[in-house]
């Protein structure tokens, strides 16, 4: 396998086949479409609590299974083993990646579930009524 990093940093790992693509807003979608599995390891600290949600949703949107640290926002988006994977230890990272790398059918099923869940829970159609209700509530509260 090849590890593809889309980042603003330079990396070199002599132990593996690695390609680094500089992150650019203009090419982000086409770059994400080059991957088979989306990885989102984060540190378990206060700063990282709000991270992970958008990245996981981007993986879901381009149809790849996401694997994320079991921490923060990712815990609320990923249904472990259904639409992605949550991992906590180095061994869990290894086990889940091996499972996904070796099983194209599983990757396809997880990807399909992820896209379905994204559309069901986070698309414009899924959230528009919620936002309208919130805005109406604010407006009505302000009028009283």
Where are these regions (language model features)?
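A short, well-ordered alpha-helix in the C-terminal region of glycosyltransferases
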Residues: 99, 106-121, 127-133
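Nucleotide-activated donor-binding/catalytic signature segment of Leloir-type glycosyltransferases, i.e.
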Residues: 4-34
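Structural loop-to-beta junction motif characteristic of Rossmann-like glycosyltransferase folds
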Residues: 37, 61-66, 82-83
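Conserved beta-strand positions in the Rossmann-like core of class I SAM-dependent methyltransferases
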Residues: 4, 67, 85
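Conserved acidic donor-binding segment of nucleotide-sugar-dependent glycosyltransferases
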Residues: 79-91, 99-105
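Cofactor-binding loop segments of dinucleotide-utilizing enzymes, especially the Rossmann-like FAD-
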Residues: 8, 69, 89
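Nucleotide-sugar-dependent
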Residues: 25-31, 38-58, 68-76
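Short, hydrophobic alpha-helical segments
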Residues: 101-105, 134-143
